[in-house]
Design a protein with these regions (language model features):
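Juxtamembrane membrane-water interface segments immediately C-terminal to a transmembrane helix
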Residues: 25-50
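Extracytoplasmic ligand-binding sensor domains of the Cache superfamily
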Residues: 48-54, 58, 62-155
């Protein structure tokens, strides 16, 4: 192999090893970062739903209670759980991969009843009152999913409808009956907010970023290799070829060649000086032999 080919081969091997190491580290970093961003997005959406629930309970419900038909007609819009769920469903128009549920062990609406894995989360919050959030992964029929969960505790406003059945609004009783959603206790963990998103969503983001990173690295390497090759050719290879060509002519007896012009003070210049001294010494020696 010629010098340029050897140099390129060395750079390609070094770049390949470096790329292998960088790809392993960067992929893991990008996957973790995408997962963290997904969880943060879920946390913001959950906070939005919780704010809607609090607003409904503290601001909207007291106003609706003053309307003339409130006592005769059940309005689901006055239920904080309902308002939070509707708000999140509206957010899902922009984030369709996210799902939200306010799961409860004893809900009024059977739709909100916790599944087994959701009940386990609620039980964990009950047994660990200092915990305010759980992040985990679980298997689903369509693949793994990341979930973010925060506890829901019964407030004084909740007990107006979910305490004793006798104290509940008649319109609620007529709509849902008395079998579910009663007997809650103040500050008791009665459910959990749960946001789920398929694991493939953050992984897809990470892998797209990873492919883009590899593309940029490859382009940068090729551009760097091209610049190095051009510099190596004009700074090292071309002067060496000229020296080799002149040395070949001199070795064949052509002593009419002029001296090389020395440019710079680098190693190539030193080789050129040495060649000139050798060439001049050879000319003197040949003249002495002729005499």
């Amino acid at each position: 192999l010629k010098l340029l080919a050897k140099f390129n081969l060395m750079l390609v091997v070094l770049f390949g090893l470096g790329l292998l190491l960088v790809s392993q580290l960067s992929l893991r970093f990008l996957e973790n970062n995408a997962r963290d961003q997904t969880i943060q997005q879920a946390r913001l959406m959950m906070s939005s739903a919780r704010s809607t629930r609090d607003y409904t309970e503290e601001e909207l419900d007291p106003l609706l209670e003053k309307t003339p038909d409130h006592a005769q007609r059940f309005l689901p819009q006055t239920i904080p759980f309902y308002a939070a769920t509707v708000t999140f469903n509206n957010l899902r128009k922009d984030y369709p991969d996210y799902t939200y549920k306010e799961a409860a062990l004893n809900p009024t609406n059977p739709r909100d009843r916790a599944d087994q894995w959701e009940a386990d989360i609620i039980g964990y919050f009950r047994n660990h009152p200092d915990k305010t959030e759980i992040i985990g992964e679980r298997p689903t029929p369509t693949g793994s999913a990341i979930y973010l969960s925060q506890p829901i505790s019964a407030s004084a406003g909740c007990l107006e409808c979910h305490g004793a059945p006798a104290a509940a609004p008649p319109t609620e009783i007529s709509t849902y009956g008395t079998s579910n959603g009663f007997g809650w206790k103040l500050n008791e963990v009665i459910g959990a907010q749960i946001v789920s998103v398929p694991t493939e969503v953050p992984l897809a983001v990470a892998h797209q970023a990873f492919r883009t990173l590899l593309l940029y690295l490859a382009v940068t390497f090729l551009a760097t290799l091209a610049v190095i090759d051009v510099g190596l050719y004009y700074i090292v290879i071309m002067p060496l070829r000229q020296l080799a060509s002149r040395a070949d002519l001199v070795s064949k007896g052509d002593l009419s060649q002029p001296e090389f012009v020395v440019k710079g003070k680098d190693e190539i210049a030193e080789v050129t000086k040495s060649f000139n001294r050798m060439y001049l010494s050879l000319i003197k020696a040949m003249r002495m032999l002729d005499e």
